[in-house]
Regions:
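Noncatalytic partner-interaction/assembly domains of nucleic-acid and motor enzyme complexes
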Residues: 1-112
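Interdomain "pre-motor" coupling segment immediately N-terminal to P-loop NTPase/helicase cores
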Residues: 91-152
């Protein structure tokens, strides 16, 4: 049987990522909640990871987090112009009806990040199996370790 090459998109939710960042602009509590649940790397779309990281930095440094402080800090960073755009940041705030659902949005982002990591782990396992350089026991031990590491 011939293997078909299928272009697959890694698990992600643009809407959840937008909602996390929009909620963080609206509420300090949302910043705390999101920063306890997520890392910059959990965001599939770079622009939201950058905004997430920037708001956490501002909050940690004791600065207010609002449209102006976020845009000013983004201007200091070497990021693409569209990420620095005030219109882009404003759109995030208007697209989120309430920050009360931050845990729900953050959980979606986290679950998709774990799924992407699991895909990478299984690709490594597959490559080790095809290479045939390691014993089955060694491959199984490493596989078990790598999968359980995703849970921590």
């Amino acid at each position: 049987m011939e293997e078909a090459l299928i272009k697959r998109i890694m698990p992600n939710s643009l809407e959840a990522e937008q909602s996390v960042v929009g909620s963080m602009i609206m509420s300090k509590d949302a910043i705390v909640t999101a920063s306890e649940m997520l890392l910059k790397e959990d965001f599939y779309h770079q622009q939201y990871g950058v905004k997430f990281e920037t708001m956490v930095e501002l909050y940690t440094e004791g600065h207010p987090v609002d449209l102006d402080t976020l845009q000013n800090r983004l201007k200091e960073k070497d990021v693409p112009q569209e990420i620095k755009s005030l219109d882009f940041v404003r759109t995030l705030v208007t697209s989120v009806p309430t920050s009360a659902n931050i845990k729900y949005y953050a959980n979606i982002v986290k679950e998709n990040a774990i799924k992407r990591k699991l895909i990478h782990v299984t690709e490594e396992i597959e490559n080790e199996c095809y290479a045939g350089k390691e014993s089955l026991e060694s491959v199984l031990d490493k596989s078990e370790h790598d999968v359980f590491e995703l849970l921590s």
